[in-house]
Amino acid sequence: MNKKAPFLLFLVMSILSCSNEKSTVETFPAPTWKQADAINEAALTKEEYYDKILGLLVGSAIGDAMGAPTEMWHRDQIRIQDGYVTNLTTLYRPDSPEGPWEDFMEAGSTTDDTRWKYLITKFLTQKENIPDSLNAKDFANFLIDQYLNEMKALKGIEAFDPEPIEKQLKQMNWLQEWAKVAKPYAEGDIDKYSYTRDRFYGGEMACAGMLYAPMIGGVYPTNPNRAYLEAFRLGIFDIGYARDITGLTAAMTARAMRPGVTYSEITAVCYEIDPLRYGNSRLVGRLAYQSYQTVKNIVAEAKKVETPSEKPLEGFLGTAIELAQLDKAYELLDDHLQQIPFHAGEIHLMNLAAIEFAEGDFQKAVEFAVNYGRDNDTVAAVTGAILGAMHGFNKLPVAMREKTLAVSKNIIRIDLEELARELTDAKYD
């Protein structure tokens, strides 16, 4: 053995030791970040859960149905046509793949916002129990299968009359954009998936995941951190911070399921729940949280108004000062609109504004969302879902909840009570 070997070994170890000591000394002291634990904030009995999950479903459907007749209208046009909307009204509008599937449907009828609640519920309950963790590829394949079923039904139509074909085409076309993204995702084709996702609905930062996120929050009740992560995982159609908003929408719904929760505790999710650390993003920070800050400022400014509105508004049941405050809030929100109304950032902003301005009151919040216009049925559906989960079915406006249940079951053919039972059984049995 070389006599110098022990000396060389000692020399190397000494250098490494000094290097380690130097590295430790030069490392700047900083706090250790630990991801928040995904824990339940409260426990729900089976009966409590059923009331809240049904409240979520029906509350969302009420919002969808109230906004559907004036979807994409400017608020001035809503006031000219209907005054201030406080109830369910007939859908005097043509059918479309994303909208109602029939012309001039009865009051209480709904659009794709409610169809998505149905579809995600069927995905969540396809197994005996709600899985501990959701699988995005399973979700993609589920949507592909649904699209293929609609395509097969179209091919099987033998009719001279075009109406049956046109009707089935609407059902297939509704899922067409989604299926084009889901297929390469399920197949693991990263390039094709990124290309199709980035041109999904024209490449807009759409509110795709927000359409089904409340239901994910509903199956992870009182566990906003877990709900966020599961919804984020299934947000495969989202671009950019729209995916963070999808997670937050689920998280707000999950917290809304907690007994005794306040509206401010629900919206506080925007800064309390951040498992993927969007708040630590360089240069930008967390845009979804900035929307929360914007809304808090807007509502505070609007509530300062003390001069009554001079012009009455047909259908508005509040005071002249309350109308002036509402108009001020709308005016301030106008400065924060996106180019396309169904941009996730705009839907998120309007949802927060509705909840904060109405201080968690279901009726007032949904009215706020509907009467602003733009993509009002989607905003009202998200707001209605969150506050429906908060208050529960039994505390929703009686006439509207009963009308919505009946129309949904008998005309739309979506039985909301049955969906709630399926989710409850999958969760508790």
Mark where each language-model region is.
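N-terminal secretory signal peptides that target proteins for export/translocation
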Residues: 1-2
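Structured, active/binding-site neighborhoods that engage oxygen-rich ligands
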Residues: 18-429
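Sec-dependent N-terminal signal peptides
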Residues: 5-14
